[in-house]
């Protein structure tokens, strides 16, 4: 793994749904991936992972050891439902408790990076107070993460509050903590009116991982690779030339497709071809 030029992973929701991580990691290995990113979203099913028993956590660790496929990151989107910026104190308290549990879970199973959703609120109307509460919630969260030695990394979002690396860097400077970094999504970054290459360059030194997906203005999910606006080759070239050597994660939602594995193989081949054109990997 450490000798590989590009660590390439796949999002959990791209693979067949289910709770058997040994099967999921075996499939990811068969498909040629180095790691899988876990999802803890706003559904009760995935939120319940944060309450796994010691034995369930150990089963995940054993699956990682057996397959050699890592689970180094968690996409924590549960804060859509329980936002840190909520003006409802009970909801906000639940959001902070989810953060505490996620950090503890990460510490237990070896997850190094928790990707945060940059929403002060999602289903409610945002205002100055929701943004203040969000900032304060991030500060408290980063203090917890620091004690656990787990990195919190902000995603560039489908939401105006955090739709550019420049905006996320403002939070990084505000928090001024090495355990808070950036996890840009080149699809989301490209769907807004951003100078994408300048934004990527600005984030170097703070980027710990990169989400890879295609998008269109106003359409942030399920855009087939090659049918959106993302200039993948230029993004990959910029990241390489800027010195980024970290992981890339193909983000897909094909878990309910007729043949998820076939969808993933098709997407992976497409992405690798663009990486090859950018000089990142050898052409197949």
UniProtKB/Swiss-Prot annotation:
The keyword Isomerase applies. SUPFAM superfamilies: Xylose isomerase-like. InterPro entries: L-Ru-5P_3-Epase, L-Ru-5P_3-Epase_Enterobacteria, Sugar_Epim/Isomerase, Xyl_isomerase-like_sf, Xyl_isomerase-like_TIM-brl. GO terms for biological process: L-ascorbic acid catabolic process. The keyword Isomerase applies. Pfam families: AP_endonuc_2 (PF01261). It catalyses: L-ribulose 5-phosphate = L-xylulose 5-phosphate. Pathway: Cofactor degradation; L-ascorbate degradation; D-xylulose 5-phosphate from L-ascorbate: step 3/4. Induction: Induced by L-ascorbate. Repressed by UlaR. Catalyzes the isomerization of L-xylulose-5-phosphate to L-ribulose-5-phosphate. Is involved in the anaerobic L-ascorbate utilization. This is L-ribulose-5-phosphate 3-epimerase UlaE. It comes from Shigella flexneri.
